[in-house]
């Protein structure tokens, strides 16, 4: 995280890795007072990049796939390449938005509640609520029934079930690990990293 105007709500889930970190930047120097507001129950996967020279607002229960990117600026002028930031415009994601893997959300965009942006899509215009958009540029795919959603907030409402689900996930993820495997990994280190 870089910048002082970054706020994160309750119960966030940030998943990162040494070679695929999350980057959240509020450009709040000089003429710019960028801010990033992240709501409650938000899921941010490895490689996600959120950059604000003006404002990026992320509603409750939003999810970001691996490598998704949001920016509210061009970061340089079109003709004057020495001009930092360019012409920033706020980005707003309403509640329960799902941004697919490697999708890019550009400046000035508002994405309505419950909408889904497909993997590797490029969004340059507002997206209505309860819809799926995908492609480059992103185009309408279909409507969604607003009464069918179970959100990340719902997921966190039963702590006992949540603990059990995470325990099952850990067991599945780590199921092939063993003490002998760990010893081998310490002796015969993988030199490709």
Where are these regions (language model features)?
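Domain-scale signature associated with acetyltransferase and cell-envelope carbohydrate enzymes
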Residues: 1-71, 94-95, 113, 129, ...
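A short, glycine- and basic residue-enriched loop/turn
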Residues: 90-91, 109, 130
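Glycine-rich NAD(P)-binding loop of Rossmann-like domains
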Residues: 31, 83-96
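Conserved catalytic-core motifs of eukaryotic protein kinase domains, centered on the activation segment
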Residues: 74-75, 81-83, 127, 143-144
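Beta-rich strand-turn-strand
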Residues: 49-53, 102-115, 121-124
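Short glycine/proline- and charge-enriched loop/turn segments
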Residues: 77-84, 149-154
């Amino acid at each position: 995280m870089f910048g002082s105007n970054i706020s994160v709500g309750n119960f966030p889930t940030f998943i990162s890795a040494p070679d695929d970190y999350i980057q959240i930047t509020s450009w709040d120097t000089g003429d710019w007072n960028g801010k990033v507001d992240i709501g409650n129950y938000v899921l941010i996967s490895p490689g996600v990049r959120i950059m604000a020279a003006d404002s990026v607002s992320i509603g409750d229960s939003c999810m970001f796939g691996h490598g998704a990117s949001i920016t509210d600026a061009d970061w340089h002028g079109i003709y004057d390449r020495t001009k930092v930031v360019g012409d920033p415009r706020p980005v707003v994601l309403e509640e329960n938005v799902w941004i697919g893997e490697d999708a890019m959300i550009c400046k000035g965009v508002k994405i309505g509640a419950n909408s889904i942006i497909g993997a590797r899509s490029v969004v340059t215009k507002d997206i209505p609520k309860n819809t799926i958009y995908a492609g480059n540029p992103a185009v309408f795919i279909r409507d969604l029934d607003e009464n069918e959603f179970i959100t990340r907030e719902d997921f966190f409402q039963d702590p006992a079930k949540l603990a059990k689900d995470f325990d099952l996930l850990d067991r599945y993820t780590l199921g092939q690990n063993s003490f002998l495997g760990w010893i081998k990994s310490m002796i015969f280190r993988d030199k490709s990293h």
